[in-house]
Amino acid sequence: MKKFFETIKNIFKIEELRKRLGYTFVLILVYRFGCQVVLPGIDANLLASFQQNTQEGLVGLLNMFSGGAFGNASIFALGVMPYISASIIVQLLAVFVPYFRKLQMEGESGRKKMNQLTRYLTILVLCIQGPAYMAALHNQIPGQAFVAVNQLGWSNFWFNMVSTLIMMGGSMFVMWLGERITDRGIGNGISLIIMIGIVARFPHAIVAEAGEKFTTTNGGFLMFIVELVIWFFVVVAAIALVQAVRRVPVQYAKRVVGNRQYGGVRQYIPLKINAAGVMPIIFAQALMLFPLLFARWDSTRGLAATLGNYTGFWYNFIFFIFVVIFTYFYTAVTVNPTMMAEELKRNGGFIPGVKPGKKTVEYLDSVMSKVTLPGSIFLGLIAILPAFAMILGVNNSFATFFGGTSLLILVGVILDTLQQIESYLLMRHYDGLMKTGRLTGRSGM
């Protein structure tokens, strides 16, 4: 414990790291303040019904990604989700369209063009999501909440137009905050913004769960402690999933330049068990809307009730299958064995016992397929853990932290940020945050 506090003290001894942490903290405060600022012309006291309907399903995911701003009808209501959607589209284009694949391989200049395209696509997504959000707002909250329309005489069209432009500006500002944190702060800015939004909900979730359990009928203090212990082990399991890798040995050929010898050492390619991150869960949650949509055509509404039951067997079974399928799909999109084999060949590396070229591609593809199977099953189980927690009597707010997107984002972003801090400490010859000095982050969200 003494060594841990010594390490924390060392963090603040490094001037650059201290400045980066301070800069990150200030920008996060700006973001959290903006999440509480309600759109002009709306009575915040009449938003209760809308907030109640933004707790579950895909809408709940949007609310989580925006740090509650979505349910607050805030100027930051659209948050970073449009940017994430645009990033996913650009990633898919880089896989399936040769022009974008070529851009991706052009180094820094190609990355700048891809980033510019992502920004343009973000604006396009905002133009769709903004009006859709305002339409949902009109359907969910009472008419008297729209003060600008009722008391100031604004037409619905102009009010919606101005509100949409404000939210678009807010979302672009959040995106800018994320980029500033990445460039001048610590960690990945966009990921940190999402994580802070999730963390902001945690105290409320703990208090709500404690309030329910500290009664004579719900298990009391002992049950609350048992839940916290179980949650701790779930967090450990999530860390294991994020950190786990299959190391493929790589040998580099010896080269002699002048009087110095290079290469000849054995290294490893770390193939992550969960290379897809949280994206399969996000895709699966989005896709779960379609069975519900088709079920509405059922005249008895029995199918809709079955598929719309978040704690029911069929919903979670289909959700689990979707997560497994999308884990394989997204891993195939993000991990390119052909490119890895070419990079090895270019640098004079080879896998012992495997011929360079096509055989290396086949070997890497085979290994990736084998490690993805347990990874996808484990990810699927973590995705449906919140439903099991709800069935066992855990409060809905706290249950979301027992697995799923919330937990994986929290674990992944914290590990990424600690990894950056670790690198600063090791560069200045201080002890790292972990005994080994080798903290492994995620490959991406």
Model-predicted segments: where are they?
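N-terminal cationic and glycine-rich segments that engage phosphates or anionic surfaces
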Residues: 1-104, 109-445
